């Protein structure tokens, strides 16, 4: 599975709306100052976190059950910064909306800027023909509160091309997260 280059990413973003909104270059500074980088890199695309967050809390004594998820386990926040409690996690989403081609599998890796602070970003692969905003899971592995920034880079997407097209894509099998918008909670 060869990895796709910046040229391919730009071409697909422009002709097939692979990523929207799309930043064709790497951005490290905006009019308001330095930011954690986002946009196109040599062999990937650094996504931004939107300003919508769901902060995990245990104030409602919920049990985390992926087959019967209780949304009361989260507090909603709309802000430019989110503080993750110690040893806890937050859900967010990308600014960017993705449309993955049928012959592509997309892998997401966290940025080292956050990893070096004990903040881990987890995203499952974006499967062939999946589309939507990517729900981001941020884990604070430290004993201190940790900060994440909206509208700045948080993770990198790598696009891998298969040697042949799959028989059944995510769209074909009616994947439950197809077309998701906003921060999406677990669906059984």
Curated annotation (Swiss-Prot):
Pathway: Pyrimidine metabolism; dUMP biosynthesis; dUMP from dCTP (dUTP route): step 1/2
Record: active site: 137
One annotated GO biological process: dUTP biosynthetic process
Reaction(s) the record says it catalyses: dCTP + H2O + H(+) = dUTP + NH4(+)
Single annotated GO MF: dCTP deaminase activity
Keyword Nucleotide-binding tagged: yes
E.C. code: 3.5.4.13
A Pfam family it matches: DCD
SUPFAM superfamilies with a match to the protein in the record: dUTPase-like
Keyword Hydrolase: yes
Keywords, alphabetical: Hydrolase, Nucleotide metabolism, Nucleotide-binding
Binding site for dCTP: 111-116, 135-137, 156, 170, 180
First-tier enzyme category under EC: hydrolase
InterPro entries given in the database record: dCTP_deaminase, dUTPase-like_sf, dUTPase_trimeric
Signal sequence coordinates: none
HAMAP family: dCTP_deaminase
Function (record text): Catalyzes the deamination of dCTP to dUTP.
Subunit annotation: Homotrimer.
Family note: Belongs to the dCTP deaminase family.
Name of protein: dCTP deaminase
Organism: Coxiella burnetii (strain RSA 493 / Nine Mile phase I)
Gene: dcd
């Amino acid at each position: 599975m060869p990895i796709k280059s910046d040229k391919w990413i730009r071409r697909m973003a422009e002709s097939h709306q692979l990523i929207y909104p799309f930043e064709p270059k790497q951005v490290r500074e905006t009019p308001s100052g330095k930011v954690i980088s986002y946009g196109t890199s040599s062999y990937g695309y650094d996504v931004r976190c939107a300003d919508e967050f769901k902060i995990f809390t245990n104030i409602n004594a919920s049990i985390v059950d992926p087959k019967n998820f209780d949304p009361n386990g989260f507090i909603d926040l709309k802000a430019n910064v989110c503080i993750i409690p110690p040893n806890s996690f937050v859900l967010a989403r990308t600014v960017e909306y993705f449309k993955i081609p049928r012959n592509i599998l997309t892998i997401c890796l966290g940025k080292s800027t956050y990893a070096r602070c004990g903040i881990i970003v987890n995203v499952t692969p974006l499967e062939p023909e999946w589309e939507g905003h990517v729900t981001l899971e941020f884990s604070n592995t430290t004993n201190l509160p940790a900060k994440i920034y909206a509208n700045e880079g948080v993770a990198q997407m790598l696009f891998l091309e298969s040697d042949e097209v799959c028989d059944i894509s995510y769209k074909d099998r009616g994947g439950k997260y197809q077309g998701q918008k906003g921060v999406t909670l677990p669906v059984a």
